């Protein structure tokens, strides 16, 4: 056992710079590939398939999307490929400035019919939704959004794609890996651990890995929270209608989550908080800005728009 371990350690020691560069490039490449080649991966994952056939993009959704592009002022040379998605919120990926372009999944619920029809059966987390129940009625109302709310939801995705922040979100992983390696190597040289027993260096490396992972989660989550807040403010700054639509959009999400919390019973209590926010998967991480925080931020913008003299 000692022989292979020593050979592996010696190999890593000789080629550590090449391994570091390759690992950082691999982390960056894996994350960015989803945006470099969004079609047909994203559409395959989120395409709406009613009655076993992919739903074409309706003229209404196409018109809505074009209206949003016009409001934002997207150049005609930027490539967008919208499609009908089964999700409750829009999804997107890609870089519109590149030849592969960007794809945007527009929820089928924006049409109203697939959800507002009580005869249409919907299964969420393995349970069929009872549209006649109070929670089912509340969910159906939450999924029915106004024109302004739909525009805000779509515009937020377009702003995300136009700003290119997807590339920024891929940086924490390789940056933290390189930083952890550089600091750990420097610390081991300073402490003279390279002249000591291998077990001591192994223990130090394990501690460095834990510290590096904590730094990665903190930087990634902090960046995500900052970007989500910026996207909301940037989208709402388009006009007062977008501010109003943003407030309604997050109100609808919170209301829908509360309805799902009731419909799903004990499982719903594990997924959603009593306020309608999503329960974090890990107790030490906040992966996304709470919906209540995003709604309250836009409500402040709306009050400032309605009564500018008071602020």
Swiss-Prot record:
Localization terms from the record: Mitochondrion inner membrane
Keywords noted in UniProt: Membrane, Mitochondrion, Mitochondrion inner membrane, Transmembrane, Transmembrane helix
Lineage: Eukaryota, Metazoa, Chordata, Craniata, Vertebrata
One term under GO cellular component: mitochondrial inner membrane
Function per UniProt: Plays a role in the early steps of cytochrome c oxidase subunit II (MT-CO2/COX2) maturation and is required for the stabilization of COX20 and the newly synthesized MT-CO2/COX2 protein.
Listed name of the protein: Transmembrane protein 177
Principal subcellular localization: mitochondrion
Protein source organism: Mus musculus
The family this protein is said to belong to: Belongs to the TMEM177 family.
Transmembrane region(s): 18-38, 165-185, 191-211
Gene name per UniProt: Tmem177
Bilayer disposition of the protein: Multi-pass membrane protein
Mitochondrial intermembrane side: 39-164, 212-311
InterPro entries: TMEM177
Description of how the protein assembles with itself and partners: Found in a complex with COX20, COA6, MT-CO2/COX2, COX18, SCO1 and SCO2. Interacts with COX20. Interacts with COX1, MT-CO2/COX2, SCO1 and SCO2 in a COX20-dependent manner.
Mitochondrial matrix-facing ranges: 1-17, 186-190
Keyword Transmembrane helix: yes
């Amino acid at each position: 056992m000692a022989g292979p371990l020593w050979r592996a350690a010696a190999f890593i020691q000789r080629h550590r710079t090449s391994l570091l560069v390759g690992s950082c490039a691999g982390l960056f490449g894996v994350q960015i590939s989803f945006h470099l080649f969004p079609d047909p991966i994203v559409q395959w994952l989120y395409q709406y398939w009613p009655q076993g056939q992919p739903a074409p993009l309706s003229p209404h959704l196409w018109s809505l999307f074009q209206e949003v592009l016009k409001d934002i002022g997207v150049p005609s040379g930027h490539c967008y490929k919208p499609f009908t998605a089964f999700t409750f919120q829009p999804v997107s990926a890609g870089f519109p400035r590149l030849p592969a372009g960007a794809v945007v999944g527009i929820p089928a619920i924006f049409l109203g019919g697939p959800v507002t029809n009580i005869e249409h059966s919907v299964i969420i987390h393995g349970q069929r939704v009872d549209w006649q129940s109070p929670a089912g009625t509340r969910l159906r109302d939450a999924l029915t959004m106004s024109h302004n709310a739909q525009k805000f939801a779509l515009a937020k995705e377009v702003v995300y794609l136009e700003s290119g922040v997807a590339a920024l979100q891929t940086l924490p992983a390789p940056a933290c890996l390189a930083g952890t390696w550089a600091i750990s190597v420097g610390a081991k040289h300073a402490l003279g651990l390279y002249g000591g027993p291998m077990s001591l260096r192994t223990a130090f490396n394990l501690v460095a890995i834990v510290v590096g992972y904590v730094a990665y989660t903190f930087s990634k989550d902090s960046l995500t929270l900052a970007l989500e807040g910026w996207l909301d403010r940037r989208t709402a700054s388009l006009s007062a209608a977008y501010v109003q639509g943003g407030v309604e959009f997050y109100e609808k999400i919170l209301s829908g989550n509360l309805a799902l919390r009731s419909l799903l019973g004990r499982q719903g209590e594990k997924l959603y908080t009593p306020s309608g926010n999503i329960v974090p998967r890990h107790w030490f991480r906040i992966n996304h800005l709470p919906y209540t925080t995003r709604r309250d931020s836009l409500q402040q913008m709306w009050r400032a728009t309605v009564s500018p003299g008071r602020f």
